[in-house]
Amino acid sequence: MMLSIVRSVDVVLEIDLAAIRANFQKISTLVGDKVKVAAVVKSDAYGLGLVDIARTLIDAGCDLLFVANLDEALLLRSSFSRVAIAVFRDEFDRFGTWYRSHGLIPVVNNCKELHAVGTAGEPQSYFLNVETGFSRFGLSVGDIQREYLLRTFERYRPSIVLSHLACGECISDPMNQLQRDRFRTVYDLLKPTRGSLSASAGVWLGKSYHFDMVRVGSALYGIHNAGVQTNPLKPVVKLRARILDVRSVPAGEAVGYGATFRTDRASRVAIVGIGYKHGLPWSCANKIFVRLAEYSAPSIGRISMEYMIIDITDVPARRCSPGTFAELLSEDFTVNDLGAAAGVSPQEALTRLGAGCTRKYLNLFPPSAAFTANRPTEAMSNPSRAKSRPMDKQALI
């Protein structure tokens, strides 16, 4: 018999859904009416919760979602019956039955998948990925030119041709123009197929990079391009963690693993219930501050698995007693700032925190007509009837 212990939550990641809606609308306004805004919700919506974030975006008017794999796509389809769902990976030539039976759109990444689409036995909508300088996925420009000469695209034309910028976050990098020009070659060849070159970073590069659609992920979640001086996006997350204990430490004493910090005065320190288990980067030790009401307190010593230690010597005791919550992310210190302090991308920092912390959603508005139209039918609500269960890929290999 297992003993169940009810415990208070020590770490809370607050997610402002109104801010996500506002960011979607802001980007839609920025790119203009002629450019579609699709939402990237891969990796559990960057750790913020796939279904909850998808519901928010559908409510904001989004009608196309991109996910990483079929597992995520099937989870979405079991909740939303009508929204278009595109899958970046999981090959159509191996899993075509799953795509067709659940109305999913494959992103075709090589010639083998392309030909599998053509021999599917029934029309299959698909997006075509072209490699323009990232060296990750996609058909080369030469591959596409060859298939064009073979009239492949006359028999089964892609709905959208897409690519991905390697250096979009650096506005002046010449790679951006090189990739845009390569993409333009394929885009012009395959007209009237629509084109999508830019993800979040490319939104800020100007209209010549927008084509017919932008695929926005990190920008929706408040991560801004470091190359853009003004940030019009709303911050989406706040991170709070509970103070578990307060201690007095003499001058000259070591703090934490490795004795990487020693007090230079008689100090008061607080042990905060957040560590790298929760996604706080180990590398941000001794580099960040937490907020305690109107006061700030520096992180000292290494980040451990469950805890971090902060110096509260200059903070009044009434502001930092055990049980008090310290604020690690806010409008003043964002996930961009945390990533910079830790030497990781803000996308990595956010995804780790989202996976490791208890989430609390703010501003859950009533669903709009757009969301209501996407409510699953009875069959879609029942995974056994809709067959929208997590994929057993091993059985198909």
UniProtKB/Swiss-Prot annotation:
The lineage of its organism: Bacteria, Pseudomonadati, Pseudomonadota, Alphaproteobacteria, Hyphomicrobiales. Its cofactor is pyridoxal 5'-phosphate. Belongs to the alanine racemase family. HAMAP family: Ala_racemase. Residues 373-397 are annotated as: Disordered. Pathway: Amino-acid biosynthesis; D-alanine biosynthesis; D-alanine from L-alanine: step 1/1; Cell wall biogenesis; peptidoglycan biosynthesis. Catalyzes the interconversion of L-alanine and D-alanine. Provides the D-alanine required for cell wall biosynthesis. The active site is at 42 (proton acceptor), 257 (proton acceptor). It is an enzyme of class 5 (isomerase). One of its GO terms (biological process) is regulation of cell shape. One of its GO terms (cellular component) is cytosol. This is Alanine racemase, biosynthetic. Its EC number is 5.1.1.1. It comes from Mesorhizobium japonicum (strain LMG 29417 / CECT 9101 / MAFF 303099) (Mesorhizobium loti (strain MAFF 303099)). The modification N6-(pyridoxal phosphate)lysine is found at residue 42. It catalyses: L-alanine = D-alanine. Gene3D superfamilies: Alanine racemase, Lyase, Ornithine Decarboxylase, Chain A, domain 1. Substrate binds at residues 136, 305. One of its GO terms (molecular function) is pyridoxal phosphate binding. SUPFAM superfamilies: Alanine racemase C-terminal domain-like, PLP-binding barrel. Keywords: Cell shape, Cell wall biogenesis/degradation, Isomerase, Peptidoglycan synthesis, Pyridoxal phosphate. InterPro entries: Ala_racemase, Ala_racemase/Decarboxylase_C, Ala_racemase_C, Ala_racemase_N, Ala_racemase_pyridoxalP-BS, PLP-binding_barrel.
